[in-house]
Amino acid sequence: LSSGGKFQKLSDSGSAVVAQPSGNPTPAAQQPAGQPSGPVKVSVDNDPVLGNKNAPVTLIEFSDYECPFCKKSFTDLLPELKKNYIDTGKVKLVYRDFPLSFHANAQKEAEAAECARSQSNDATYFKFHDQIFTQSTVGGTGLALTQLPVIAKNLGLNVNQFQQCLDSGKFKDEVAKDMADGTAIGVSGTPSWVIGASSKDGQIEGQLIVGAQPFSAFKAIIDEKLNGK
């Protein structure tokens, strides 16, 4: 499925590119915005899971906390996915980080959510995740790093432990692993997703979706996977 919704990617020079398939795109926006030919295969790694861990279908999201189109997916798409598939036990969402270099605080925001998780569990991770997207300014421009320990405090976490974790860069390599795995399957911007049948070894082979797609695009693929196709 090619990109039917906007997403942010890196150009060859490392600058931001907003890709959109409709109209007359600029030369920069004509850089590849779709998916590799054929299915892709990627691990869920040890990343946080939202929903039933034994769900038959896995949705892996590669996302950036400062990406405006990731925020759009958070506000528009995620509630529909939760209502129809995640909360009903049919789909589990695995969140993997893909912080783009031109978003100044995205890397540390990704590490911060992992620091929150390390004190508790996946549920706490997604509470932290939700707060970053909810509190980010219109357009998803992210938060000041000083706001991250405030979120941690509001979630009942040990703030000193959280700040030490964040300052140490404990999860820098974890975030880099997510980036490397995404890049290996052709992810070049956010949000990007892989939908496939769940597997015992955590290797998900499935469809790569790029951009802030509507719920209908996900529904069509998820229903196919649920029907064993």
Ranges and model annotations:
Residues 55, 60-153, 185-188:
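Structural alpha/beta surface segment adjacent to cysteine/selenocysteine redox centers
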Residues 44-47, 78-80, 179-180:
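A generic local structural motif
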Residues 28-43:
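Short coil-to-helix leader/linker segments, especially the first N-terminal amphipathic alpha-helix
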Residues 49-51, 99-101, 210:
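Generic, ordered loop/turn and secondary-structure boundary motif
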Residues 40-57:
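A short beta-strand-turn-helix
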